[in-house]
């Protein structure tokens, strides 16, 4: 059979769609399997090879599951709101709707051309009204239950994109979208109280099967810490400065306090501060810095000592000075810290620069740097002599609580989610601002709050949303009191639509609810979710938060959305570097399909290395996969033959290997095993037709077009994609014979082949006949024989 991919790949793709091979519906007589991949952001560049790898893993797994009799849901959609599309639309003077539709059409064509087995009847688009209606509905539920609030805050602002960014979207002081420097700006911000779910999000990680690194990243992102809150009285006024610390045991080593420059107590007691002009000047300097710049560990320490305000250490009773410094953030902890320079590197550097005392309270340091290890407590009154950190912390908390000056507590690194953007291409936030009633929710029966069509959607110079210019949208009536009111003009961030998309796939055409209870009960949770490591914090934590909230209010049936989460490694350029246009090392999957066919692309990407690790692209290996599929096709032209014990054993070993490797995402070794198998077939020069059919079913998840063609060429009228997955006979996977090492006095003299179940006498007879020990035993008497069944026969003689 000639491997002519151009002739049959599009044919089988059309047949699959015509006959709805991958379309599924609720069938309670079957076990369900919900496989999920991260739906793409449809960029103008189209799909890249990274998409093929990201989807290819679960593509193989879901095809196998379907053949194993599972009712498989494997959907796809498009996460199409967001800044990249809007920025491109502005640049090209094209409406975002047009850009989005064109890009989705391009992506759809490319995905179908690769032969992905998605259920195309369930496609969702986050920009469609029948989708974002329910995004708005969930937002209003969050608002209704007190998990949405508005506050004026210093926020991360991208001057290029002209919008507010969350901490997650501005890591490293750079905009996640355009990579411009982020600045700080005071704006009204909508927040989701994700911190209220911090403990539940941590606890939920114990009930799921995620890669260890994914669990670790989420735990670190949430950042739960155990410690204590303590109140330092201010000497000059009737006020207490509240701090949080994970090391209350070091409180006797506090020699100064540091407040964030924005701390409200500074303005409250401005008249008491003798150098307020210095404070104001320092604040102005801080306002020019991003949060990233302020919190860099290796930056030069700056600050101002407050003249006229002094703190009292609650345990020692000593007076300590108060500074303001930019490395303390108002949004972290309480906005103030106690400084223990002897045991904190940052505090040590600050103390050295400003000439503050350094008092060690843990034995072990040399005084030349901060000692951050464990040791015996010193200079700490009732804590002296304690060597166990946990005991010292507990003792300190106990005294603080007894004195009414503090209490044990927990803090989280994760902050509430900044949820609004001053841009056009996003879900309108369904809130009305009324002078009498405040912030009022748009009634549920008025959803969706539609995004108005705009020809000019460039953000305002001051960061004002383009929607603010649409009077017909802005001006409205308060749903509560009927007075004139104004609509919220900011839109939701791109993360909104992706925080629940896995639920809409279950019931994408339902106009009455986001998903029916029947569909939820049957399909949820997602059995296996695969995606990039770059999304295991932001997207996954956001979506877990939304899902857990919906569970708590009785709208979904499982506390966690994803039972299992895995991740693929990057595909690097041929030079071993990350692919980028600037490096000129980008590989276009369309060119590979044009030149070699979709099956070669699919097989190569699954074969190129450990699926979870990064692998460089290799054109020569692509050609090697083409030769492999040529040889597979060539087996159809081979003479037939009767099955033998050897051929059956080889096939059953292959079934076992491929089955296990797919389940464990060891796709490369599964393909390597198939390559080895056909080498044996070519060595034999013939293949049994029934055994060839079994091989074709094993190939089907990897190279489905060729598999379908061969299946029909072998006389079958059904789809191999729906053919039962082959089962192996364990007894036929065990070798009948084994090769064992023959040793004399512990030194290898050769090997012999013996029956796998051979006892010592049988093995010895074979060794004697082989002559492998004749020379070694000449003139000697055997003293002892040592036989390790199936491995070694050692002879001792003298």
Task: Enumerate the language-model features and the residues they cover.
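Conserved oxyanion/phosphate-binding beta-strand-loop segments in alpha/beta enzyme cores
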Residues: 1-36, 66-75, 99-106, 282-323, ...
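Residue patterns forming the tRNA-binding/recognition surfaces of aminoacyl-tRNA synthetases
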Residues: 2, 11, 15-19, 91-241, ...
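Long, charged, mostly alpha-helical binding arms that flank functional sites
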Residues: 3, 224-229, 363-366, 370-398, ...
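NTP-handling and nucleic-acid-processing catalytic cores
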Residues: 3, 8-13, 49, 135-358, ...
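N-terminal catalytic cores of NTP/NDP-binding nucleotidyl/phosphoryl-transfer enzymes
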Residues: 25-96, 100, 123-138, 245-246, ...
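Secondary-structure transition/capping motifs at alpha-helix termini
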Residues: 63-71, 91-97, 113-117, 144-150, ...
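Helix-rich, typically C-terminal accessory recognition domains appended to large enzymatic cores
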Residues: 79, 144-156, 160, 408-437, ...
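Long, His/Glu/Asp-enriched segments that create or flank divalent metal/ion-associated functional microenvironments
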Residues: 441-478, 483-487, 493, 741-745
């Amino acid at each position: 059979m000639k491997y002519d991919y151009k002739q049959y790949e599009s044919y089988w793709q059309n047949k699959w769609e015509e006959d709805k091979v991958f379309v599924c519906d609720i069938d309670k007589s079957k076990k369900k399997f919900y496989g999920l991949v991260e739906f793409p952001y449809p960029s103008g560049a189209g799909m890249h090879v990274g998409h093929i790898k990201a989807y290819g893993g679960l593509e193989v797994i879901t095809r196998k599951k379907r053949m194993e009799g599972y009712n498989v849901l494997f959907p796809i959609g498009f996460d199409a709101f967001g800044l990249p599309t809007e920025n491109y639309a502005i640049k090209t003077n094209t409406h975002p709707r047009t850009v989005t539709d064109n890009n989705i059409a391009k992506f759809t064509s490319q995905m179908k051309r690769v032969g992905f087995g998605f259920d195309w009847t369930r496609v969702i688009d986050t920009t469609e009204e029948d989708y974002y209606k329910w995004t708005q509905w969930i937002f209003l539920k969050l608002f209704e239950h007190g998990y949405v609030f508005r506050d004026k805050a210093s926020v991360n602002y991208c001057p290029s994109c002209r919008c507010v960014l969350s901490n997650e979207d501005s890591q490293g002081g750079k905009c996640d979208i355009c990579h411009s420097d982020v600045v700080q700006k005071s704006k009204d911000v909508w927040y989701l109280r994700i911190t209220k779910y911090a403990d539940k999000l941590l606890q939920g990680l114990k009930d799921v099967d995620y890669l260890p690194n994914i669990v670790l990243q989420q735990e670190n992102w949430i950042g739960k810490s155990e410690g204590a809150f303590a109140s330092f009285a201010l000497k000059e006024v009737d006020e207490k400065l509240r701090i949080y610390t994970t090391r209350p045991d070091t409180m006797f080593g506090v020699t100064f306090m540091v407040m964030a420059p924005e701390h409200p107590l500074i303005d409250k007691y401005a008249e008491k501060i003798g150098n307020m002009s210095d404070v104001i000047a320092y604040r102005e300097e801080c306002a020019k810095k991003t949060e990233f710049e302020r919190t860099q560990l290796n930056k030069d320490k700056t600050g101002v000592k407050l003249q006229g305000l002094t703190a009292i250490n609650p345990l020692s009773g000593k007076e300590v000075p108060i500074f303001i410094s930019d490395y303390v953030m108002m949004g972290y902890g309480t906005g103030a810290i106690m400084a223990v320079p002897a045991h904190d590197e940052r505090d040590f550097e600050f103390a050295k620069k400003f000439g503050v005392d350094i008092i060690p309270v843990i034995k072990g340091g040399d005084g030349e740097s901060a000692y951050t290890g464990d040791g015996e407590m010193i200079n700490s009154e009732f804590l002296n002599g304690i060597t166990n950190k946990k005991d010292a912390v507990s003792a300190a908390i106990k005294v603080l609580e007894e004195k009414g000056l503090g209490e044990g507590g927990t803090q989280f690194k994760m902050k509430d989610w900044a949820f609004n953007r001053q841009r056009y291409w996003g879900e309108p936030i369904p809130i009305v601002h009324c002078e009498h009633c405040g912030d009022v929710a748009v009634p549920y029966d008025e959803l969706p709050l539609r995004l108005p069509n705009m020809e000019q959607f460039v953000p305002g110079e001051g960061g004002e949303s383009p929607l603010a210019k649409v009077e017909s949208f802005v001006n409205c009536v308060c749903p509560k009191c009927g007075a004139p009111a104004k609509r919220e003009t900011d839109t939701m961030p791109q993360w909104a639509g992706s925080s629940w998309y896995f639920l809409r796939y279950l019931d994408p055409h339902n106009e009455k609810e986001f998903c029916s209870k029947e569909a939820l009960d049957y399909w949820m949770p997602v059995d296996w979710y695969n995606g990039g490591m770059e999304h295991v914090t932001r997207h996954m934590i956001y979506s877990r938060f939304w899902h857990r909230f919906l569970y708590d209010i009785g709208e979904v049936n499982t506390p966690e959305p994803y039972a299992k989460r895995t991740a693929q490694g990057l595909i690097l350029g041929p030079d071993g570097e990350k692919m980028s246009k600037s490096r000129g090392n980008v590989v276009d999957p369309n060119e590979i399909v044009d030149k070699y066919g979709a099956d070669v692309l699919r097989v190569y990407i699954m074969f190129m290395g450990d699926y979870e690790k990064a692998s460089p692209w290799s054109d020569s290996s692509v050609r090697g996969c083409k030769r492999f599929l040529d040889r597979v096709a060539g087996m159809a032209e081979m003479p037939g033959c009767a099955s033998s014990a050897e051929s059956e054993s080889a096939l059953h070993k292959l079934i076992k290997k491929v089955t296990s490797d797919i389940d464990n995402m060891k796709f490369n070794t599964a393909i390597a095993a198939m390559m080895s198998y056909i080498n044996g077939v070519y060595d034999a020069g013939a293949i049994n037709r029934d055994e060839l059919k079994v091989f074709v079913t094993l190939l089907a998840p990897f190279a489905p077009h060729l598999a379908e063609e061969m299946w029909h060429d072998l006389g079958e009228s059904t789809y191999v994609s729906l053919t039962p997955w082959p089962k192996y006979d364990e007894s036929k996977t065990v070798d009948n014979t084994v090769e064992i090492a023959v040793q004399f006095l512990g030194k290898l003299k050769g090997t012999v082949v013996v029956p796998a179940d051979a006892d010592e006498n049988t093995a010895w007879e074979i060794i004697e006949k082989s002559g492998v020990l004749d020379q070694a035993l000449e003139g000697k008497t055997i003293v002892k024989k040592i036989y390790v069944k199936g491995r070694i026969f050692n002879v001792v003689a003298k």
